């Protein structure tokens, strides 16, 4: 189990899922995974589609930054979702990130595992 604010954690997952729904391409597949690590649990949301250009990877966490402005106009995204994720994870003192895959993109965050009593 993990200790984390349930509403803030839900906000992170919701933002990742919203992005996955809007940016899924190719087979339009989305998967959510939860993997236990030594000290953390990593939750990830993967969607098929185009990878994020390497030059944009660090910028996507900034408020109002949009990689594909034309596509964002189609669904009305504001460009603040990932900055909210970053702020929440920073407040938790935990990590979040993104990994490009050949067939899509995986956004992830980690939560510290609770201690057994």
Predicted regions and their residues:
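A residue-level detector for a conserved hydrophobic packing site
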Residues: 9-10
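Short conserved segment of the HATPase_c
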Residues: 52-66
